[in-house]
Amino acid sequence: MNQILIQGVIIIISLLSIIIINQKDIILINIKNKYIKQISLLLIIYFIYIGIYINYLFNNNILGFQLINNYININWGIDGISLWLINLTLILLPISLISNWNISKNEDKSKVLTYVLLILIIGIIIILNFICLDLITFYILFEATLLPLFILIGKLGSLPYNGNNKIIIKGINNNNITPREKAAYYIFIYTLFSSLFMLLSIGIYIYMINNIDYNNIYNIILSIDLQSIIFIGLIIGILVKTPVFPVHTWLPLVHAESPISGSIILAGIIIKLAIYAIIRLILINLSDVIIIYNPLIYTIGILTIFYIGLITLKQIDIKVIIAYSSIIHMAIAIMSIFSNNILGIEGSLLISIAHGFASPALFLLVGGILYDRYHSRLIYYYQSLATYMPIFSIYLLIAGLFNMGIPLSLNFIGEFLSLNGIFIYNSLFAILSTFSLFITTIYQMKLTTKLLYGYKSIYINIWSIWGNDVNKRELLLLNILFFFIILFGIYPNLIIKSLNLSISSLLYIPF
């Protein structure tokens, strides 16, 4: 019953979205901006209510998918892995919506409506991606987030500012595109092109099993050559989506130009689809070829950690620094998920969930507070903020500690389990992976000290800073994110007990 309820609500909202878009000139006549946002927030809260109900029904002692239902000729269901990715999505959706709550101050109704609909549509697509049980639907939903994200970044991303904090509007006849439009094209072209290889591999899967259901993949035996073809196609699409070196260049640009809600959704949820795709499409039936290609995957992961870590130290854009931090964390997650042991796979998922809380918190601080107030992403633009914005400074320091993996945080648990899992697989790779801990500490402390301490910035009027500290709305969002990081860091078994059986079915015996 609950599956039908979820799918029915999602389809109804999707249809209403299409109707509103087509008839927005009529509907918007009597609707104020604040009501548009409040209605969308109520819909998300309703999804959260359904998510709580699903958690109540979920049985941690049952192996495989639960609450399975066939709706519109597609099988839907959840296991322990998809359950917690859905939970993460439901937590971050209202945060992403509220993060840009003040969008209506200088925007018309159509742009506000476009914004809230894009957030809802992206959330719906991601949730459907986590609960679908067939290959075709998975691929369609896997790529379907591109279009709304493209519009969100290209139309609502950051605008260039001059020295007087005036928006620079480019002329109609100017052939140059704005940085936010460039970022939108980057993510669209990069991920769409790489997904063609993924589509080829999924097509081979479907041809071999003559079916589109996940469960049938377990029942086929593939030759090494065929496994290699499928693996290469899938891993290309996944590594670009994650991303890792050398196909990482789109992520810093996209984060830098995205609205804060776009950065929260991208860092918190969308790049986790790559980890989920590895579990659903690679680990279940490509174990023989994983053993062959694992050294290559681990080498890419180590190169990503070292290269990205070093170039992060040279960055002066505060949002780009956080974006590069995401790449390093996801490189650890990729390595540990291929470790073929419970500790490694659990650690990979816990890192993904922890990163889904910590990275949005950092983006909210530097992109949703500093950038919204002073319209600059340059690290040298800000100094001595601890004197004038004490509450902001405390939260930035705490978020930085979480990002570094301080004990009693979920980040610490995820990194500890991941590195243990990598060590079980190969001690040399584990030792090299620990470089991520040191480099993360260095660039995070650099970011914190540059922003909070030192001499007063010559670029900011002191009197303009007073009273610009964190407001109640921002405090609420940050406290929610910090609460879950600490809660799951102190009691990680809340998540792990749901993952154990699902992960145990992914392990294989090396030949």
Curated annotation (Swiss-Prot):
GO terms for biological process: ATP synthesis coupled electron transport; electron transport coupled proton transport. GO terms for cellular component: mitochondrial membrane. The keyword Heme does not apply. It catalyses: a ubiquinone + NADH + 5 H(+)(in) = a ubiquinol + NAD(+) + 4 H(+)(out). It is found in: Mitochondrion membrane. Its main location: mitochondrion. It comes from the Eukaryota. InterPro entries: NADH_Q_OxRdtase_chainM/4 (IPR010227), NADH_UbQ_OxRdtase (IPR003918), ND/Mrp_TM (IPR001750). It is a multi-pass membrane protein. Belongs to the complex I subunit 4 family. This is NADH-ubiquinone oxidoreductase chain 4. It comes from Wickerhamomyces canadensis.
